[in-house]
Amino acid sequence: MEILKYLLILSLPIIALFISKKYSAFVDSILERARGYYLFLCHIERMLGSYLTPPHRLGDGFSHPSLEDMMMRISAGDSLIDAYRACCGSLPSSVDETLTEFFSDFGKGDVSLELRRVREAISRIDAALSVEGAEGEKQKKICSVIAPSLAIGLVIWMI
């Protein structure tokens, strides 16, 4: 029975470190997905600024690991909002609201209106990314301190 106690004591810090690393990777993946959408909107802005592109061709020439499913859906003929809803994943709420609004109304105006809307969406997402990036770093630091501290506290309590 004593050996199980010591195995548990040894495993708690390792488990805490694992949880901390997993949470950090989760936060990073959310921010990376949001950055991917930011880059996609920049790509749409360039496409609209240079020539008229049908919606199913907006993903041409764009590649981002987080958005591969969405690009396949767009090239298959899904509307931007349908492709986004099917593939959006976890995103900060402000980014999700901006993208939902933009993709829902995309193609309902002339080129100048669409350019204005995409530039507005880009600036809103850029602002959200800077806020969410700083907040994500804080959350990762807190988790990297709290999880091992709790593990150490449990180890001390068990001894």
Tell me what each language-model feature is.
Residues 19, 33, 91, 103, ...:
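Sparse, context-dependent recognition of short Cys/His-centered cofactor- or disulfide-binding micro-motifs
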Residues 6-19, 132-159:
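Bilayer-spanning, highly hydrophobic alpha-helical transmembrane segments
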Residues 43-121:
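Glycine- and small-hydrophobic-enriched helix-loop-helix hairpins
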Residues 16-19, 23, 97, 104, ...:
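Generic signal for short, ordered secondary-structure residues
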Residues 2-75:
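Juxtamembrane/interface alpha-helical elements of multi-pass membrane proteins
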Residues 37-38, 80, 145:
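Short hydrophobic/aromatic segments of transmembrane alpha-helices and their interfaces
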Residues 1, 67-79, 136-140, 152-159:
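Short, Lys/Arg-enriched charge-dense amphipathic segments
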Residues 105-149:
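Membrane-interface, cytosolic juxtamembrane amphipathic helix immediately N-terminal to a transmembrane helix
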